[in-house]
Structures are given as C-alpha cells and as structure tokens.
Amino acid sequence: GTYQSTLTYFPYLSKEWKKNCEKERLLGVSITGQWDCAIVRDPKVLEKLKNEAIRVNKKYAQKFGINQSTCVTCVKPSGNTSQTVDCSSGMHTRHAPYYIRRVRISATDALFKMLKDQGVPHYPEVGQSREDATTFVLEFPIKAPDGAICKDDVGAIDQLEHWKVVK
C-alpha cells in the first residue's frame, strides 16, 4: 500500500489533486469478513493491527523517501475480495442465509455466452431489452456457511458499537 501511494500520475486530474495525493499518501489495508471471524472484532487485536500497519507504512515511507500516510484505513466493504474468499463484506454481516448474487456482464463477453449456454439465469440491464441489450445481469443463488452471522442476527445498537470500535 505504501508503494501504491507513490503512483500519483493522474493525467486526467488536476495538479492540485496530485499534490494532495502526494501529501496525504492515503493507505487502505483491507480487513474484511469481520462478522465471520470473532478475533478481528476484538478491539485489542484491531489496535495491534492498526499499529502494525502504521509501523510498516512509516518504515517504507522512509525507504521510498515519501511522506508517511496521514490516514490508514483498515475497513472497506471489499465486495470483490469477500466474494472471492466467501466471507462477509468488510465490517458488515452477511445479508441472509440464502440470497441471490447479481453480477453485471457485457453481452459480448465470451464468459457471458458460456454462462448463458450453461443455463445461468440472465436478464437485460434495467432499461434495455433482451434483443438489444449491451449488458446482462446474471443471477447466482448463494448459501451462507452454516452458523454465519446475518443482518437479522445483530441489532442496530450492536452494529453501531462495532462501528465505533473500527472507526
């Protein structure tokens, strides 16, 4: 992440934004699946992880001759990561024990043709017709692991208290 913060050439953004990126060197360290792993909801563990991320950032910022990050963020929704490793997203619980995952894909994508031929349910993007759709929405049934914590298992106050810990 510290190395990534050195990649500040954005020709489509203003010079002021480049300066801002170089000054702040924001760093995102993803801790996803928190409601699937009780240990990463432990405030003491989170504090240790935060301190380690800051320590490593400081070390590599010095090696690269750049500013240390002004903010190290350790919680992101991490939608793609959570789907890849089958865990809850970021600091959120899973939606439900069973749900439909919808994925958008180009009508010209070879993967779309293969999935369509395999019988995966697919629908044209909202506002498009089946005949001239450029984007389709695929639907995949998902079953959460047995014992997974879902949104109806955690009250609003408990969610807020957890947010305050990771904030």
Regions found by a protein language model. Name each.
Residues 1-13, 23, 77, 84-167:
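Catalytic alpha/beta core of large soluble enzyme barrels
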Residues 8-18, 26, 31-77:
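Internal maturation/activation junctions in enzymes
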Residues 70, 83-84:
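Short capping micro-motif at the N-terminus of alpha-helices
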